């Protein structure tokens, strides 16, 4: 049975969301079509408001309402530590575990030949400038334990190799291979950071 083209377009739009397959996209499409106009208008308004009013921090790319996010502007954070993560979800996951009190840098992607993602498509290229302009003594690389995450970590280490007086670490055992931080529980995150391994002095 064929569906209206508008329905198929709605399903395609929903499938573009992370982790949403055809089955769930159709389920959500049917749900949305069954709602009244007020629900739909409010739903759309919330998306537009979020897109309009939420911006990225000029330092770390964390989301907030100001140029400088609540973490980067918090005087109680440890400004000598910088943790490099891949996504906003990774940052949120670590923050929710209350195991780290330094600053962050979100790369917004990992180097991937398979996905055609190069350095220029990410925030990796500005890490060195941020380190040079900051007072960091410790860099913790917390990219995923995947092929792309390891390639990205290696690139960051090489990029910072001529900067003296900083220690560079990689998150330790705990995060499974081919996995990312946002899937780890609190104890796993705690162990991976506590067991971070030094990869350069």
UniProtKB/Swiss-Prot annotation:
- Zinc finger intervals, C4-type: 57-72
- Key word Zinc present in the record? yes
Classification via Gene3D superfamilies: 3.40.1360.10, RecR Domain 1 (1.10.8.420)
- Return one GO MF term: zinc ion binding
* InterPro entries linked: DNA_Rcmb_RecR, Rcmb_RecR, TOPRIM_dom, TOPRIM_RecR
Question: In the UniProt record, does the keyword NADP occur?
Answer: no
Query: What keywords are assigned to this protein?
Result: DNA damage, DNA recombination, DNA repair, Metal-binding, Zinc, Zinc-finger
Domain Toprim: start-end pairs = 80-176
Q: Name one Pfam family in it.
A: Toprim_4
Give an example GO biological process.
Answer: DNA recombination
HAMAP family from the entry? RecR
* Described purpose of this protein according to its UniProt entry: May play a role in DNA repair. It seems to be involved in an RecBC-independent recombinational process of DNA repair. It may act with RecF and RecO.
Give the protein family. Answer: Belongs to the RecR family.
Descriptive protein name: Recombination protein RecR
Name its species. Answer: Ureaplasma urealyticum serovar 10 (strain ATCC 33699 / Western)
């Amino acid at each position: 049975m064929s569906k209206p083209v508008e329905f198929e377009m709605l399903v395609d739009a929903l499938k573009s969301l992370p982790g949403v397959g055809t089955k769930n996209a159709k389920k959500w499409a049917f749900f949305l079509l069954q709602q009244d106009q007020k629900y739909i208008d409010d739903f759309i308004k919330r998306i537009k408001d979020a897109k309009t009013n939420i911006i990225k921090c000029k330092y770390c790319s964390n989301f907030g309402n100001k140029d400088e996010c609540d973490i980067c502007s918090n005087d109680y954070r440890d400004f000598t530590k910088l943790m490099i993560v891949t996504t906003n979800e990774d940052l949120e996951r670590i923050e929710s575990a209350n195991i780290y009190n330094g600053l962050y840098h979100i790369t917004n992607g990992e180097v991937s030949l398979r996905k055609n993602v190069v350095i220029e498509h990410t925030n990796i290229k500005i890490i060195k400038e941020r380190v040079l302009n900051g007072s960091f003594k410790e860099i913790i690389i917390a990219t995923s334990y995947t092929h792309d995450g390891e390639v990205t970590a290696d690139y960051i280490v090489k990029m910072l190799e001529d900067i003296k007086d900083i220690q560079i670490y990689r998150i330790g055992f705990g995060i499974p291979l081919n996995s990312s931080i946002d899937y780890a529980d609190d104890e796993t995150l705690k162990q991976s950071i506590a067991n971070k391994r030094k990869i350069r002095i």
